[in-house]
Amino acid sequence: MPPLHKQLTIVVGIIELDNRFLILRRVDEVPLWHHKWELPGGKIEAGEIPADALRREVFEETGLQIGEPQLLGIHTHHWNLPELTQQTFLIAYKASAKSDGVTLCPEENDAFQWVTLDEFLSISDHLEANKDMIAALYAPLQKA
């Protein structure tokens, strides 16, 4: 594993509607992440509260308004990139979408789906960090 050179904290949201949640297909110059399915979310800006960052990121990426985000927890993932290892902290929330009218930001994503938990877990081309986080923090809630 290359040495740890970068640490990043992001918010991600499991945005629910009608017993499904929203996933987006990423457009990225990094091949490891390009055309991988992911949850809406992104970087927290300076001075921003994580729940507000989630609202902003979801709106920027999808045009959706969401209800009050509920904190699921924090998950850590290490990305082994060719030149470094990036440690990413994912602050995970779930929230309800106020509508299903998704308008994608084409610079960030080129497709979306509303999926069940089982459908998401069966997708092979997803961001590993999202799948690990969902398995750790969200899936146990669905089985309770």
Language-model features and meaning:
Residues M1-L22, K43, L90, K94:
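Conserved N-terminal beta-strand and adjoining loop/helix that marks the start
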Residues P3-Q7, W33-K36, E83-F89, P106:
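A generic structural micro-feature
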Residues I14, W37, Q113:
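Residues that recognize and position ribonucleotide moieties
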Residues R20-E60:
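Conserved Nudix-box catalytic region and its N-terminal flanking loop in Nudix hydrolases
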Residues K36, K43, L81, I134-A136:
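A generic membrane alpha-helix/interface feature
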Residues I44-G67, H77-A129:
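Unchanged
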Residues L72-G73:
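Local beta-strand/beta-hairpin segments that build beta-sheet-rich folds
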Residues A129-A144:
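Charged phosphate-binding loop/patch that engages nucleotide di/tri-phosphates or the phosphate backbone
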